[in-house]
């Protein structure tokens, strides 16, 4: 029990910096689910916009960055939330999601949206956090909404 408490107390959230980009790419490509078939689909311009203009947070522990989230504060869309496979179940995803939705509330949003693959662990994670499925988009991904 004390190991669980100790691990969770060592998690830190902070804004992402340019110095985090190599590790952010490792995290993004270090997930078994939702692999990018073409890594060039996520452009440096897109990542730079989120870093400069949106909510872009990392979760780290004593080892380093283990997860990140990017949220468009203008639309309430959660563009990305990833935790590297070896760090699942340690609270990184929950803390990132809670912080992102809190920030959206602070800027006046009453709801948030995201999409994820159908039948994935991510789908179960979002459902367990109270996100409601709204149907599927044209790519077959589940569209979720959370009232803030």
Where are each of the predicted segments found?
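Extreme N-terminus of proteins, especially the signal/transit-peptide cleavage junction
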Residues: 3-11
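Conserved acetyl-CoA-binding loop-helix of GNAT-fold acetyltransferases
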Residues: 89-102, 127-128
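Terminal substrate-recognition subdomain of acyl/acetyltransferases
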Residues: 2-4, 132, 137-148
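Acetyl-CoA-dependent GNAT
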Residues: 11, 15-80, 84-86, 97, ...
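Conserved GNAT acetyl-CoA-binding A-motif
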Residues: 104-117
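Conserved active-site alpha-helix within GNAT-family acetyltransferase domains
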Residues: 94, 118-135, 142
